């Protein structure tokens, strides 16, 4: 699977760009602030419905414009080309078009364009809050199990309703109807996450052993409530506490996926360069797992490739990315930083003040 064409209009500092893309490596080279990250962000937005540097639509729409428009052509790997499009106005209203028809959902774009994002801010996967690691697990569940998205979406809805009800009820019997809906959803989502974390742990360990052979890494999934407790009984037992807090304190919305190096949390032991390498290993392992189990490739978006990595680590990452056979988009300040990746099959774009040239 590869994005063969990308059209960008009024996104960040890019007025208009029409890019024919290589199926392998695509390099975006330019000074800081030139717009190279905006190209990566446009690709990410086309596959997610939102940008990775801002959740507010108005901030990514070009100054004095009412909306941004993104179009893409996808080679699905089976000899079929798909057309996708996304527009969003300053009020946040989106329009999704797939193969010429309107009325589609952003989740359909995400299903068609699985992608892994590696940015200088991506350390949050390792040293940020549990929500970043839940998102990592949920990406894998979403692309690997079709029932996951519906269950996850319903879980979020019921949790929101239960938390609102906690502000109004006085007895547990009044909130039991929400719990009767919440419990099976919580157990379904948790079971899918647990199965995925167990399945991918071996892939992560193998990739990490190549990237960080000096450490013994271990991985553990925590579902968000006590392992020995029945969730329905726990909700009833802690009703008064939840009512005082006005939110549900335990459940799958508190799940986590922890990584330790030699028994110590990685964020307490590894250097920034090692953390970035570990983050890259996690993203690579997840993408390769998807390919092996579904036959589908994901896109890799790498912003500021050289950040935190010395020449040896850059070379190692370049070799692993090449071995995937996936489409890769890489931004760098100058061509010297990506020398280990460049070959005759790749394509280099020079970006300057929102203008993009081959």
UniProtKB/Swiss-Prot annotation:
SUPFAM superfamilies linked to this entry: P-loop containing nucleoside triphosphate hydrolases
Positions of ATP binding: 30-37
GO cellular component: cytoplasm
Subcellular location: Cytoplasm
InterPro entries per the UniProt record, alphabetical: DNA-binding_RecF, DNA-binding_RecF_CS, P-loop_NTPase, RecF/RecN/SMC_N, RecF_2
Keyword Ribosomal protein set for record: no
GO biological process, one term: DNA synthesis involved in DNA repair
Keywords, ordered alphabetically: ATP-binding, Cytoplasm, DNA damage, DNA repair, DNA replication, DNA-binding, Nucleotide-binding, SOS response
Major location category of this protein: cytoplasm
Entry keyword DNA-binding: yes
UniProt cross-references to Pfam families, sorted A to Z: SMC_N (PF02463)
GO molecular-function terms, A-Z: ATP binding; single-stranded DNA binding
Entry superkingdom: Bacteria
Cross-referenced PANTHER family: DNA REPLICATION AND REPAIR PROTEIN RECF (PTHR32182:SF0)
Protein's job: The RecF protein is involved in DNA metabolism; it is required for DNA replication and normal SOS inducibility. RecF binds preferentially to single-stranded, linear DNA. It also seems to bind ATP.
UniProt family annotation: Belongs to the RecF family.
The protein's name in its UniProt record: DNA replication and repair protein RecF
Annotated organism of origin: Edwardsiella ictaluri (strain 93-146)
């Amino acid at each position: 699977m590869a994005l063969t064409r990308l059209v960008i209009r009024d996104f960040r500092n890019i007025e208009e760009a029409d890019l024919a893309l290589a199926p392998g490596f695509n390099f975006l080279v330019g000074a800081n602030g030139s717009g190279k990250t905006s190209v990566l962000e446009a690709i990410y937005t086309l596959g997610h419905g939102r940008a990775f540097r801002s959740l507010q639509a108005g901030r990514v729409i070009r100054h004095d414009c009412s909306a941004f428009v993104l179009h893409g052509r996808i080679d699905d790997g089976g000899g079929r080309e798909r057309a996708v499009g996304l527009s969003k106005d300053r009020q946040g209203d989106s329009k999704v078009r797939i193969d010429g028809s309107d009325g589609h959902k952003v989740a359909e774009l995400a299903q068609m364009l699985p992608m892994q994002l590696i940015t200088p801010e991506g350390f949050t996967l390792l040293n940020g809050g549990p929500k970043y690691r839940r998102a990592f697990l949920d990406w894998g569940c979403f692309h690997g199990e079709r029932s996951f998205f519906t269950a996850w979406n319903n879980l979020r809805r019921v949790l929101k309703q239960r938390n609102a009800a906690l502000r109004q009820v006085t007895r547990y019997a009044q909130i039991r109807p929400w719990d009767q809906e919440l419990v099976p959803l919580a157990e379904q989502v948790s079971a899918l996450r647990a199965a995925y974390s167990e399945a991918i742990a071996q892939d992560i360990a193998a990739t990490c052993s190549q990237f960080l052979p000096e450490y013994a890494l271990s991985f553990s999934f925590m579902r968000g409530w006590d392992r020995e407790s029945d969730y329905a009984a726990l909700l009833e037992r802690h009703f008064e506490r939840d009512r005082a807090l006005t939110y549900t304190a335990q459940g799958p919305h508190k799940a986590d996926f922890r990584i330790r190096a030699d028994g110590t949390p990685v964020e307490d032991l590894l250097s920034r360069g090692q953390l970035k390498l570990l983050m890259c290993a996690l993203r690579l392992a997840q993408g390769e797992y998807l390919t092996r189990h579904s036959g589908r490739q994901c896109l890799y978006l790498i912003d500021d490739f050289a950040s935190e990595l010395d020449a040896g680590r850059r070379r190692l990452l370049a070799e692993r990315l090449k071995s995937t056979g996936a489409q890769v988009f890489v931004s760098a300040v100058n061509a010297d930083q990506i020398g280990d990746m460049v070959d005759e099959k790749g394509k280099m774009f020079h970006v300057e003040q929102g203008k993009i040239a081959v």
